[in-house]
Amino acid sequence: MSSYVANSFYKQSPNIPAYNMQTCGNYGSASEVQASRYCYGGLDLSITFPPPAPSNSLHGVDMAANPRAHPDRPACSAAAAPGHAPGRDEAAPLNPGMYSQKAARPALEERAKSSGEIKEEQAQTGQPAGLSQPPAPPQIYPWMTKLHMSHETDGKRSRTSYTRYQTLELEKEFHFNRYLTRRRRIEIANNLCLNERQIKIWFQNRRMKWKKDSKMKSKEAL
């Protein structure tokens, strides 16, 4: 049924010569174009072109020399009524769509990144060469720390406080050997997390105490 209606909707009359651009005169006058005949359901739907009106334009536009020849034609100012639709030049600006907004976001992000990089470069160049950032403190491992705390204030060296374990090991070593060689002194310092000077001073003080005690005992014996 649909194919029958589609085939019978428009039926063109027998072959009509094609539209010839060379026989149209000045830009294709309507009078020189052959009329087409169409029929549908027994009705004649032929198209006829009215004869052209005399004109003084080269392009076939009807423009009378006297503007009073068409009194019914409204003026241009009257045509532009308050409720008229805007023309092509007066068309409202188009609202940017979703895709244009998405395309504008990367551009804004790139501008923000570039401005941030410029600010960082200015901040780096603004610092003088002498005022550089302080170096990070060196990492201290447990084996590098010492058990004693020695603080130097007012140019005077404070007394070294030995731990109980250090004192016990030094007393054992003094009991077997009251005078240490440099090699043995370095070995004990490494084992007790002390330096060679501290070991040397401790043995000096311990020998003085030992001599003092021995003198006291000799006097009491007399």
Swiss-Prot record:
PROSITE patterns hit by this protein: ANTENNAPEDIA (PS00032), HOMEOBOX_1 (PS00027), HOMEOBOX_2 (PS50071)
Membrane spanning stretches: none
Cell location: Nucleus
Cross-referenced InterPro entries: Antp_homeobox_Deformed_sf (IPR050609), HD (IPR001356), HD_metazoa (IPR020479), Homeobox_antennapedia (IPR017995), Homeobox_Antennapedia_CS (IPR001827), Homeobox_CS (IPR017970), Homeodomain-like_sf (IPR009057)
Region ranges (Disordered): 68-141
Location of the DNA-binding region in this protein: 155-214
Pfam families for the chain: Homeodomain
Gene Ontology biological-process entries: anterior/posterior pattern specification; embryonic skeletal system development; regulation of transcription by RNA polymerase II
This protein's GO CC annotations: cell junction; chromatin; nucleoplasm; nucleus
GO-annotated molecular function: DNA-binding transcription factor activity; DNA-binding transcription factor activity, RNA polymerase II-specific; RNA polymerase II cis-regulatory region sequence-specific DNA binding
Chain location of the short sequence motif Antp-type hexapeptide per the record: 140-145
UniProt keyword annotations, A-Z: Developmental protein, DNA-binding, Homeobox, Nucleus, Transcription, Transcription regulation
Family statement drawn from the similarity comment of this UniProt entry: Belongs to the Antp homeobox family.
Function: Sequence-specific transcription factor which is part of a developmental regulatory system that provides cells with specific positional identities on the anterior-posterior axis.
Protein name: Homeobox protein Hox-C5
UniProt organism field: Homo sapiens (Human)
